């Protein structure tokens, strides 16, 4: 991704202000990103769409799975599809918080301290193998993810807009891994699992990557202004009271049937993801189906049961037992 100008796309041609954006045009822009990423990631259409709904809903994404299934490649492909800044942070046990946020350095010529921003200051930040870093370093992301800013030595520095974190973590790190604190987990709008590709998809993938990897030739297909407008349009999607009430009943069910249920932040993320899902379907309003389509990926990782059940089971029960009224 670069900071260069990008040709105006249809979303910009049809609208001069966010309120005037054609939802169908935004949907077309999103589909162009999905198609672009699929030239690199074969057989993961649903995961790519879920990342896009998180981006439209101003959320962050956690990709969790076994090593080697393409988590980092997927994050890179999505980030490369936008014409903005992209930074990667490889989390390791010896990584310091200042390695993420940046430091103040004394300038001998000006006799003043100057801030040197860390890699967190980018439009799309890839936090690779985030669970390999100790909790203190992981916490460097908290303020940035929640408030789009970082405080270093008492001074607050704003993140570029838009700002999104796509983090990966492996599930088989054992003693070398640290559990993510719940305060950090709750800041991810979605948690996704890629899984292994289908046999035909894997054969197709091998044919694409044996020689020159397609990620090397991947180009941006939308500009930052496109993404800003798409986010603004998504925020304008109507969420009627019955849909808000339905989402709240789902969230309340998780609180009543788990040791730790979904937070109000999770409820907000559920509706924002529902707005983005409506945009993908070309609608200017959210329906219960949108909420249901996003519920597992938005809610399950925020739930702690304290028993044999996991968050996905609790969400499945909620979707089955909570009625749409």
Residue ranges: model-predicted function:
Residues 55-93:
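Walker A/P-loop
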Residues 9, 23-27, 177, 194-260, ...:
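Conserved C-terminal "switch" segment of AAA+ ATPases
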Residues 88-120, 176-184:
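Conserved AAA+ P-loop NTPase core
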Residues 10-20, 256-325:
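C-terminal engagement/docking regions of AAA+ P-loop ATPases
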Residues 51-53, 106-126, 130, 155:
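Conserved alpha-helical scaffold flanking the Walker A/P-loop in AAA+ ATPase domains
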Residues 107-112, 133-137, 146-221, 230-236, ...:
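Canonical AAA+ ATPase core
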Residues 65, 128-129, 140:
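Walker B catalytic acidic pair
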């Amino acid at each position: 991704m670069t900071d260069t100008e990008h040709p105006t796309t249809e979303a910009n041609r049809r609208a001069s202000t966010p309120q005037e954006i054609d939802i169908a045009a935004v949907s077309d822009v999103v589909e162009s990103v999905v198609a672009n990423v699929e030239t690199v990631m074969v057989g993961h259409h649903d995961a790519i769409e879920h990342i896009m709904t998180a981006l439209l809903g101003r959320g962050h994404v956690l990709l969790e799975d076994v090593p080697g299934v393409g988590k980092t490649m997927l994050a890179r492909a999505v980030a490369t599809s936008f014409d903005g800044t992209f930074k990667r942070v490889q989390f390791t046990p010896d990584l310091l918080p200042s390695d993420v946020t940046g430091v103040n350095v004394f300038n001998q010529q000006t006799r003043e301290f100057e801030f040197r921003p860390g890699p967190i200051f980018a439009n799309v930040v890839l936090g690779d193998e985030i669970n390999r870093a100790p909790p203190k370093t992981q916490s460097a992301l908290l303020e940035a993810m929640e408030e789009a800013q970082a405080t270093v030595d008492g001074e607050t520095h704003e993140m570029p807009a838009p700002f999104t974190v796509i983090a990966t973590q492996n599930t088989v790190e054992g003693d070398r891994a640290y559990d993510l604190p719940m305060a950090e987990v709750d800041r991810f709008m979605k948690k996704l699992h890629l899984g292994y590709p289908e046999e035909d998809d894997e054969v197709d993938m091998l044919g694409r990557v044996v020689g020159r990897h397609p990620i090397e030739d991947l180009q941006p297909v939308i500009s930052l202004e496109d993404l800003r407008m798409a986010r603004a349009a998504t925020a304008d999607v109507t969420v009627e009271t019955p849909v808000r009430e339905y989402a709240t009943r789902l969230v309340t069910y998780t609180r009543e049937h788990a040791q730790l249920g979904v937070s109000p932040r999770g409820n907000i993320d559920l509706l924002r993801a529902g707005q983005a899902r409506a945009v993908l379907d070309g609608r200017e309003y959210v329906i219960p189906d949108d909420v249901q389509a996003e519920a597992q990926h938005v809610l399950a990782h925020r739930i702690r049961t304290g028993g044999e059940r996991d968050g996905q089971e609790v969400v499945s029960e909620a979707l089955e037992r909570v009625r749409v009224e």
